[in-house]
């Protein structure tokens, strides 16, 4: 069976990995004034941050229409047997709901599983990479979904924000907004927990912010892989990657750039650290579709329940 993997542009995946692992990315929408752009297609990261810094144009985002997901699914099902579509947290975005609606517009919708990652940026990205490697290795849809279910609660994400201005304007803070409504010149650290953003600290300098991200990495257990995401400061991202490699040099650490859809909420200077902890008792590792010798059989799942799967 051939399984294709779909995600949305808020995953912030590096382009080379998208191509290498044959991942389909449905773009979210970025809105500046009265103009709507497709994330990464009609507008680039540089253009977004230029508008934010120099033009001071109010920005917002929206999920793609269900038809965009339906079109992607229909094209893939011409050659694929099944699809797993992994989306940004449903608690902060309508992307998962849009994907579910798009699925229901497609003939053969029972061959599509939609999964709520309960994360964003490379938290979603790391889960998507895992699913794509499993699919490339020939794993079944139930196995991929089972491993996603195991990995989602073990995927961690922290964001360092140079300013709270864009975070507060974006309206995605939920419970964190009341705690971050201060006008003090602080730089906030937020974490993703149960699909929502929560404040976890504040610092007054970028250096201290990077140290906080490093401290969070040190507290993680059995890290499988990690990612550093930046908006406008690639040197800081490289420094953070090198610091992580110095602590744990055996895990892959990806660097990517915060895409337009999340960039308008994070703003210039944002740094994100995402990591995925190993699943307990899982004696298996997949690398770019090559199966290693040590394997375990995962419990089978009742297939009909997977067809509308959304965590």
Region roles according to the model:
Residues 71-81, 216-222:
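Glycine-rich phosphate/diphosphate-binding loops that line cofactor/substrate pockets in enzymes
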Residues 75-88, 94-97:
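Ordered, amphipathic secondary-structure segments that act as subunit-interaction surfaces
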Residues 80-83, 111-115:
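Short, flexible active-site-proximal loops enriched in glycine and acidic residues
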Residues 288-306:
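Positively charged N-terminal leader segments that act as targeting/secretion signals
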Residues 62-72:
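Glycine-rich, highly charged phosphate/nucleotide-binding loops
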Residues 4-63:
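N-terminal glycine-rich anion-binding loop in soluble enzyme alpha/beta folds
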Residues 4, 10-24, 29, 92-113, ...:
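Mixed-charge interfacial surface used for oligomerization/domain docking
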């Amino acid at each position: 069976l051939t399984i294709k993997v779909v995600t949305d542009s808020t995953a912030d995946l590096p382009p080379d990995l998208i191509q290498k692992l044959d991942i389909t990315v449905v773009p979210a929408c970025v809105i500046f004034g009265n103009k709507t752009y497709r994330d990464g297609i009609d507008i680039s990261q540089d253009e977004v941050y230029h508008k934010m810094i120099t033009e001071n144009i109010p920005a917002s985002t929206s999920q793609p229409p269900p038809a965009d997901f339906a079109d992607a699914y229909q094209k893939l099902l011409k050659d694929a047997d099944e699809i797993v579509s992994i989306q940004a947290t449903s608690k902060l975005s309508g992307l998962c709901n849009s994907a579910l609606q798009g699925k229901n517009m497609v003939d053969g919708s029972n061959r599509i599983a939609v999964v709520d990652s309960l994360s964003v940026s490379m938290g979603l990205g790391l889960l998507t990479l895992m699913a794509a490697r499993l699919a490339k290795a020939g794993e079944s849809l139930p196995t991929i979904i089972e491993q996603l279910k195991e990995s989602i609660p073990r995927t961690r994400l922290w964001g360092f924000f140079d300013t709270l201005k864009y975070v507060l304007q974006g309206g995605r803070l939920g419970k964190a907004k009341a705690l971050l409504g201060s006008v003090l010149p602080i730089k906030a650290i937020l974490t993703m927990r149960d699909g929502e953003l929560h404040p976890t600290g504040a610092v007054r300098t970028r250096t201290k912010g990077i140290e906080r991200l490093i401290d969070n990495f040190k507290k993680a257990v059995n890290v499988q892989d990690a990612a550093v995401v930046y908006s406008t400061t690639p040197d800081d991202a490289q420094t953070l990657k090198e610091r992580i490699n110095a602590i744990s040099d055996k895990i892959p650490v990806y660097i990517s750039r915060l895409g337009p859809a999340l960039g308008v909420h994070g703003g210039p200077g944002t740094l994100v650290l995402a990591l995925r902890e190993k699943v307990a008792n899982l004696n298996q590792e997949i690398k770019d579709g090559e199966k290693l010798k040590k394997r375990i059989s995962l419990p089978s799942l009742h297939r009909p329940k997977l067809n509308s799967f959304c965590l």
